[in-house]
A protein has these predicted regions:
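Hydrophobic h-region of N-terminal signal peptides that target proteins for export
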Residues: 11-20
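A short, structured surface patch at a secondary-structure boundary
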Residues: 27-91, 95, 191-194
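His/Asp/Glu-enriched short active-site or ligand-binding loop at hydrolase and phosphoryl-transfer sites
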Residues: 52, 176-198, 245
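Flexible loop/hinge segments that line or gate small-molecule binding clefts
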Residues: 56, 95-124
């Protein structure tokens, strides 16, 4: 084989590999609601063929439901012939093993513990779906917004903040979580910063005298919780009318866009009652 023909063969082979890589994940199943949301943010929803019963945007598009939050219907998944199934640490190891036994590629995304991890996962997903440039642009925009927001709040005294994400039992957002970063990025001090577990008593919260109380929306219970806290009139958060309800669908979802939207909302709330 002469040199010219060899170069041509190499070029054809390389092109085939690239085309194969580009078409690798044309049929995607997501068993992670936040990943499903990110697929929509990346405008790659046309590749999504299956989702969980908690994947709101996909349900609206009538995508095939193949799982609950923790239990997958493997038979249904196999019938959809996916190129890849994206799972989380909540997905049953048995289900993952069964899918792999059927020759299905399974990619696991761990639960993001920080905004940086959220960003890394978004870019990793972008690479999988040939949307890396778009993903990196979104992350750059989100980080620029954080930088801008950090300049809008200035405190004379660092405020103590309680962020509640459960009512029965009362559950506090901890440090070293992506939701804990809402508090640090607001320039506040988390009253639960020294705790190892999130379950707290009402007495504990009262003893910490928070300046702000944020409660994630939990239907009627969030409104009831706000009313309950308002009975404790000695609390600084009550005295200064600083009890706020935050959209749980955004605050609890580890995606870069919902993270920024929540931070913007909380910053606005703080500025109103500074």
């Amino acid at each position: 084989m002469n040199r010219k023909r060899l170069i041509m063969v190499v070029c054809i082979f390389t092109t085939c590999l690239l085309l194969s890589a580009q078409k690798r994940y044309q049929r995607v199943i997501s068993l992670v609601p936040s990943i499903t949301q990110n697929i929509y943010y990346l405008k790659a929803e046309s590749r999504l063929v299956g989702c969980t019963s908690y994947c709101t945007p996909a349900l609206a598009d009538k995508k095939e439901v193949v799982a609950t939050a923790i239990e997958a219907n493997v038979e249904k998944i196999v019938l959809l012939k996916p190129d890849v199934v994206i799972v989380s640490t909540l997905t049953s190891p048995k289900d993952i093993a069964t899918m792999r036994k059927f020759g299905i590629e399974v990619v696991e995304f761990a639960s993001a513990k920080s905004f940086e991890e959220i960003c890394s996962q978004y870019i990793a997903l972008g690479k999988m779906l040939e949307k890396q440039t778009e993903a990196e642009k979104t992350i750059d925009e989100c980080k620029a917004k954080i930088k801008k927001l950090s300049k809008t709040l200035r405190w004379n005294v660092v405020p103590k903040i309680f962020f509640q994400i459960g009512a029965d039992p009362i559950f506090a957002v901890l440090d070293n979580t992506f939701m804990g970063e809402y508090i640090s990025m607001l320039g506040g001090k988390n009253i639960a910063s020294k705790l190892e577990h999130g379950i707290v008593s009402r007495e504990f919260v009262i003893s910490q005298a928070p300046d702000f109380i944020f409660i994630t929306s939990m239907g009627i219970s969030s409104e009831e919780e706000a009313k309950t806290w308002k009975r404790y009139t000695t609390l600084p958060a009550v005295k200064n009318n600083r009890i706020f309800i935050v959209d749980a669908n955004k605050a609890c979802q580890p995606t870069p866009i919902t993270f920024i939207e929540t931070l913007e909302e909380m910053t606005k709330m703080c500025k109103q009652r500074r």
